[in-house]
Amino acid sequence: MNSSDWKMFFLTCADVLGPGDLLPFRNESWCSWTTFSRLRSDAGYWQSGLPRRADIGDEWIGDGGVWGQPFAYADIAHIIIPREFHWRGILQGALDEGIKQQDIDVLSSELNKHAIAHRKTNLVLEMKFY
């Protein structure tokens, strides 16, 4: 997967799934991802909304956006986009929660139009490179 494919992947996600945010209750989209660097360190994953169009660069996800720090496309090892995600937050002074749906079927169809390889199950759409 080259940088232009990654850029198209993230732009397609932004267009199909909507804007992301750091907090799930303010999101239209949600994902988990890890990098090769992090796999070598602690094997952890980050969670956040998908990057907004303004965060998506030619070679990386930019600093200070939805993901909070830069991520080079070449370092992304695995990204998971769930069909639905649970959110919880304080809205109008009260705890609220719910489930949001993500149309990974439409996303998969759009990614196929751009020849971007991915895997889709009944639970997630993912790209894994390890």
Put a short name on every predicted segment.
Residues 125-129:
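Minor-groove-contacting beta-hairpin "wing" of winged helix-turn-helix DNA-binding domains
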